[in-house]
Design a protein with these regions (language model features):
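A generic structural micro-feature
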Residues: 46-50, 69-73, 111, 125-131
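Residues in well-ordered beta-strands of folded domains
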Residues: 31-33, 55-57, 80, 118, ...
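Extracellular/virion structural assembly segments
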Residues: 70, 84-101
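Oligomerization/assembly interface segments of phage tail-like spikes and tubes
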Residues: 70-85, 129-140
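Acidic-leaning, charged glycine-interspersed low-complexity segments
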Residues: 98-140
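Hydrophobic aliphatic residue packing
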Residues: 54-55, 79, 92-96
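Small/polar-rich, solvent-exposed N-terminal microdomains that initiate assembly or binding
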Residues: 1-60, 64-67, 87
């Protein structure tokens, strides 16, 4: 059975377990797909979202088949570093790169081949800086 769709759990683990990145971004500020609003346990009010934070998502999964069976999947992930400070956004993006690039995972569920950084682009939205990083890897 193929478990490629579970790769996001391992992407998250690689980021939260990286010491360089954990100094810059708390593990509860690394989000799959979107930022999760949190409520203050005492007041029940929404807590303010603070910078920096990271959003990651799978952008594609392309299976490769032969006549007989599935041989591997090529997965692409986008990791977006969000900050209100340009230098900080660069430091966090660099730490994300160190956490993911070249890493491979082999266990009973998945065989993730070394992760490759495909591209990085910068953009702004109002007073917010985004470092958009595209990663790809094969799972077989």
């Amino acid at each position: 059975m193929d478990n490629s769709i579970l790769a996001g759990k391992y992407i998250y683990s690689l980021m939260v377990e990286n010491e360089e990145l954990s100094v810059l971004v708390d593990s509860d500020k690394i989000y799959p797909l979107r930022v999760e609003l949190r409520l203050d346990p005492d007041t029940g009010e929404e807590q303010e979202i603070t910078f920096p934070f990271i959003i990651y998502s799978m952008t594609s999964l392309e299976p490769t088949y032969t006549k007989n069976f599935l041989t591997e999947n090529l997965l692409k992930y986008t990791v977006i570093v969000v900050s209100d400070d340009y230098d900080n956004s660069l430091e966090v993006a660099n730490a994300v790169r160190h956490a993911l690039e070249g890493k491979a995972i082999r266990n009973e569920y998945l065989n993730i081949c070394p992760i490759k950084l495909d591209s990085v682009t910068e953009e702004t939205m109002e007073d917010t800086i985004l470092q958009r990083m595209e990663f790809s890897f094969a799972v077989n």
